[in-house]
């Protein structure tokens, strides 16, 4: 068996097209332009690249992009003052603070300062609680993207056995909650799980998100399963020590011979994250104005 390769890049392009259509409708019908504000504290090179990508994609779909770059020595009080200003700004429907922030700032406190209705990263305890209780909130972008890929590949997830490896607040827990909402039977696996390989072999849906390169081997995977690889590890390239390569949590070449479908790294889950950030911003905009939520962009 050779697995179907799930093309996250192509699917994300489709999500962005839906976002752009909804942005155009909001502008032409209601005179509203969704706005996303991104705050960057310090000069982390990787963060600067991520922020630039978010700005570019935000503008490409027709939304307003508000970028705020603050010096590394910015105090908590000054950062909170900016967040309060963005919370109160009716032109801003989504707020994201790019992490990591400098060590003197507390990331949890930063997230807590953002209005949950504008927390388009879905990281606040309010949005996490809404998800856990089955209520309507804003969902963390990467789990939302994975769910979109799974729905597209499998349709109805009811009754399927799903195993999520990793229990982080950022991904694992919300991924498990989303799968429960879809009526899958969910097992949350982690570093203390006994006989992890045996647990994984039960899964119709296997989601790996622990950051250990090629941990999931072919004999961990049920034949025909759908495998979603969320892990990213950068390692020296075996053929050129001056270059690096990205590896996922799954031994891709081996598992692709067993699975029914699999996401590659890169090009699988990664592109979905920003696409879902844009989707969440449109959803937040519609909710702020009491308008119907766009089809296919929210859960």
Swiss-Prot record:
InterPro entries: Aminoacid_DH-like_N_sf, NAD(P)-bd_dom_sf, THF_DH/CycHdrlase, THF_DH/CycHdrlase_cat_dom, THF_DH/CycHdrlase_CS, THF_DH/CycHdrlase_NAD-bd_dom. NADP(+) binds at residues 166-168, 191, 232. The keyword Disulfide bond does not apply. GO terms for cellular component: cytosol. GO terms for biological process: L-histidine biosynthetic process; methionine biosynthetic process; purine nucleotide biosynthetic process; tetrahydrofolate interconversion. Keywords: Amino-acid biosynthesis, Histidine biosynthesis, Hydrolase, Methionine biosynthesis, Multifunctional enzyme, NADP, One-carbon metabolism, Oxidoreductase, Purine biosynthesis. Its EC number is 1.5.1.5, 3.5.4.9. It holds the Pfam family THF_DHG_CYH_C. GO terms for molecular function: methenyltetrahydrofolate cyclohydrolase activity; methylenetetrahydrofolate dehydrogenase (NADP+) activity. It catalyses: (6R)-5,10-methylene-5,6,7,8-tetrahydrofolate + NADP(+) = (6R)-5,10-methenyltetrahydrofolate + NADPH; (6R)-5,10-methenyltetrahydrofolate + H2O = (6R)-10-formyltetrahydrofolate + H(+). The keyword GTP-binding does not apply. Pathway: One-carbon metabolism; tetrahydrofolate interconversion. Catalyzes the oxidation of 5,10-methylenetetrahydrofolate to 5,10-methenyltetrahydrofolate and then the hydrolysis of 5,10-methenyltetrahydrofolate to 10-formyltetrahydrofolate. Homodimer. Belongs to the tetrahydrofolate dehydrogenase/cyclohydrolase family. NCBIfam families: PRK14186.1 (NF010783), PRK14188.1 (NF010785). This is Bifunctional protein FolD. It comes from Dinoroseobacter shibae (strain DSM 16493 / NCIMB 14021 / DFL 12).
């Amino acid at each position: 068996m050779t697995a179907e390769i799930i093309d996250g890049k192509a699917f994300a392009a489709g999500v962005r097209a839906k976002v752009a259509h909804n942005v155009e409708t909001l502008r032409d019908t209601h005179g509203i332009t969704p706005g996303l504000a991104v705050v960057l504290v310090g000069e982390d090179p990787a963060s600067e690249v991520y922020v630039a990508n978010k700005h570019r994609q935000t503008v490409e779909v027709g939304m307003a992009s508000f970028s705020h770059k603050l010096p590394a020595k910015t105090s908590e009080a000054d950062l909170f003052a900016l967040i309060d200003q963005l919370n109160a700004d009716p032109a801003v429907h989504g707020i994201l603070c790019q992490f990591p922030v400098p060590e003197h700032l507390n990331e949890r406190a930063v997230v807590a300062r953002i209005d949950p209705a504008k927390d388009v990263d879905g990281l606040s305890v309010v949005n996490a609680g809404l998800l856990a209780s089955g209520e309507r909130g804003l969902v963390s972008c990467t789990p939302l993207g994975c769910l979109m890929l799974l729905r597209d590949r499998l349709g109805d997830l009811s009754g399927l056995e799903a195993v999520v490896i990793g229990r982080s607040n950022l991904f694992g827990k919300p991924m498990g909650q989303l799968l429960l909402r879809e009526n899958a039977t969910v097992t949350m696996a982690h570093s203390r799980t006994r006989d992890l390989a045996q647990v994984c072999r039960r899964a119709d849906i296997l989601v790996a998100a622990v950051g250990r390169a090629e941990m999931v081997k072919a004999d961990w995977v049920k034949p025909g399963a759908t495998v979603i690889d969320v892990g990213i590890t950068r390692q020296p390239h075996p053929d050129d020590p001056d270059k690096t390569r990205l590896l996922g949590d799954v031994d891709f070449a081996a598992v692709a011979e067993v699975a029914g479908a699999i996401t590659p790294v890169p090009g699988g889950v990664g592109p979905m994250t920003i696409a879902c950030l844009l989707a969440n911003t449109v959803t937040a905009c519609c909710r702020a104005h009491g308008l119907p939520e766009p089809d296919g962009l929210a859960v």
